């Protein structure tokens, strides 16, 4: 029943989102007329080579209207973004519910492990669809935006993706990409699934062995302070794997859609670092260990 209810709510939200998109276009069409008037007024002023009281008053009115139009369009877009966030949240809840139902349904045969190529594609899609933080003027980026860590009392929710420090088969420790199953306030420990094993490899880990992944991309053009900076030590997901390794930031993103360029620690190279490789904001987190000398 819960899945049916979620489907119904998602359908409602999609209808509301469609209406908001139509409103955005209508608002934009209305504002275009005013913007054309502003441009024409400036052209007349240049032709006459003077700023008369008439033009000054006219421009003030036109710009006031343009500002109000832009704010109205911005408000509609923010409402649309809220709808998208709610839809994504419901889809995630539905995925988790289906996963739990599958785990406890003995009448169905066990699922086959996901093909590696499919998993890598899903990880890329997750990075691409990570929402960009768009704050109002004066707003500071929140925790889990880009390089900003979670607050000290933050508890990751079931379904959240994290970097988890686990013991490998050989006895060494490594950071893996994992999904939170649950958190116990009594023991202060997480249960997480190795993302590469689809729930077959479950780990119970203390909070200090868990690093929540970013929930928003930071915009380099408006919030550069929310990004890791050049030569900063991080843990980054090595391309085409599900493991995090130590790396130095080579180049931070310059535009919202850009990835980090990082140098992974690699003793097979003379300087101890790999050539630059691209890693999405979604899969770069702080490394608390010191740099290797």
From Swiss-Prot:
Interacts with dimethylated and trimethylated 'Lys-4' of histone H3 (H3K4me2 and H3K4me3), with a preference for the trimethylated form (H3K4me3). Component of some SAGA-type complexes. Component of the ADA2A-containing complex (ATAC), composed of KAT14, KAT2A, TADA2L, TADA3L, ZZ3, MBIP, WDR5, YEATS2, CCDC101 and DR1. Interacts with (methylated) CGAS. Interacts with TADA3L, GCN5L2, SUPT3H and MYC. It comes from Rattus norvegicus. The keyword Nucleotide-binding does not apply. Residues 3-88 form a coiled coil. The SGF29 C-terminal (also named tudor-like) domain mediates binding to methylated 'Lys-4' of histone H3 (H3K4me). PROSITE patterns: SGF29_C (PS51518). One of its GO terms (cellular component) is SAGA-type complex. Residues 152-293 form the SGF29 C-terminal domain. It is found in: Nucleus. Residues 194-196, 240-243 are annotated as: Histone H3K4me3 N-terminus binding. GO terms for molecular function: histone H3K36me3 reader activity; methylated histone binding; methylation-dependent protein binding. Belongs to the SGF29 family. Keywords: Acetylation, Chromatin regulator, Coiled coil, Nucleus, Transcription, Transcription regulation. Pfam families: SGF29_Tudor. Residues 264-266 are annotated as: Histone H3K4me3 binding. The modification N6-acetyllysine is found at residue 288. The keyword Transferase does not apply. It comes from the Eukaryota. InterPro entries: SGF29, SGF29_tudor-like_dom, Tudor_SGF29_rpt1, Tudor_SGF29_rpt2. Widely expressed with highest levels in testis. Highly expressed in hepatoma and other tumor cell lines. The record marks 238, 245 as: Histone H3K4me3 binding. Gene3D superfamilies: 2.30.30.140. GO terms for biological process: negative regulation of transcription by RNA polymerase II; regulation of cell cycle; regulation of cell division; regulation of DNA repair; regulation of DNA-templated transcription; regulation of embryonic development; regulation of transcription by RNA polymerase II; response to endoplasmic reticulum stress. This is SAGA-associated factor 29. Chromatin reader component of some histone acetyltransferase (HAT) SAGA-type complexes like the TFTC-HAT, ATAC or STAGA complexes. SGF29 specifically recognizes and binds methylated 'Lys-4' of histone H3 (H3K4me), with a preference for trimethylated form (H3K4me3). In the SAGA-type complexes, SGF29 is required to recruit complexes to H3K4me. Involved in the response to endoplasmic reticulum (ER) stress by recruiting the SAGA complex to H3K4me, thereby promoting histone H3 acetylation and cell survival.
